[in-house]
Curated annotation (Swiss-Prot):
Protein species of origin: Synechococcus sp. (strain CC9902)
Location in or out of the cell: Cytoplasm
Record InterPro entries: ClpP (IPR001907), ClpP/crotonase-like_dom_sf (IPR029045), ClpP/TepA (IPR023562), ClpP_His_AS (IPR033135)
Protein name (Swiss-Prot/TrEMBL): ATP-dependent Clp protease proteolytic subunit 2
Enzyme Commission number(s) from the entry: 3.4.21.92
HAMAP family assigned: ClpP (MF_00444)
Active site per database record: 103 (nucleophile), 128
UniProt entry tagged with the keyword Coiled coil: no
Primary localisation category: cytoplasm
Gene Ontology cellular-component terms listed: cytoplasm; endopeptidase Clp complex
Record's subunit section: Fourteen ClpP subunits assemble into 2 heptameric rings which stack back to back to give a disk-like structure with a central cavity, resembling the structure of eukaryotic proteasomes.
This protein's encoding gene: clpP2
């Protein structure tokens, strides 16, 4: 199941010697090794993205996988499942931000293959620390607080690794919502380049 915003899906009709075949647009693009993350991140979204990446790896372990990201973020554990798979699969993973990549969306954007992390000119990127809350007895709140702190340290460490920024700067910048333009995201190290108007900077479909 391609991950995209809800609503009716455009259909692509292909003609062949066996007759016409209809595909929804996202399934057709999956054949071109293009995956969309166009919604919040939860367990169902993670399962679908992981399955698509593993399928494309099995199809051809040498051709790039492209992931288009327009996501407000979501579950940290679900996002880390996607991230770990991105690092595990044999093909390079090209990440392309269109619209907004925020929170876990920005983290996944930065986790693409170095040199192949892109953004469209008017995209926005936002990083911040994990959000969380706890209710119940004091011991339960303490357990949740420790887990949130652990996840924060894990994400900050990985962001420092992918951006080249010092860990203390990552910790300071993610203490509150931190918005960046594509050019600022390049300077920060979250992405590698901005796609220009001609498309020459990187959105390429394998033929």
């Amino acid at each position: 199941m391609p991950i995209s915003a809800p609503g009716p899906l455009p259909t692509v009709v292909e003609q062949s010697g066996r007759g016409d075949r209809a595909f929804d647009i996202y399934s057709r693009l999956l054949r071109e090794r293009i995956i969309f993350l166009g919604t919040g991140v939860d367990d169902a979204v993670a399962d679908a993205l992981v399955a698509q990446m593993l399928f494309l790896e099995a199809e051809d372990p040498e051709k790039d996988i492209q992931i288009y990201v327009n996501s407000p973020g979501g579950s940290v554990t679900a996002g880390l499942a996607i991230y770990d798979t991105m690092q595990q699969v044999a093909p390079d993973v090209v990440t392309i931000c269109y619209g907004l990549a925020a929170s876990m969306g920005a983290f996944l954007l930065s986790g693409g293959t170095k040199g192949k992390r892109l953004a469209l000119p008017n995209a926005r990127i936002m990083i911040h620390q994990p959000l969380g809350g706890a209710q119940g007895q004091a011991v339960d709140i303490e357990i949740q607080a420790k887990e949130i702190l652990f996840l924060k340290e894990t994400l900050n460490g990985l962001l420092a690794e992918h951006t080249g920024q010092p860990l203390d700067k990552i910790s300071e910048d993610t203490d509150r919502d931190y918005f960046l333009s594509p050019a600022e995201a390049v300077e920060y190290g979250l992405i590698d380049r901005v796609v220009d108007s001609s498309g020459d900077e990187g959105i390429v479909t394998d033929g």
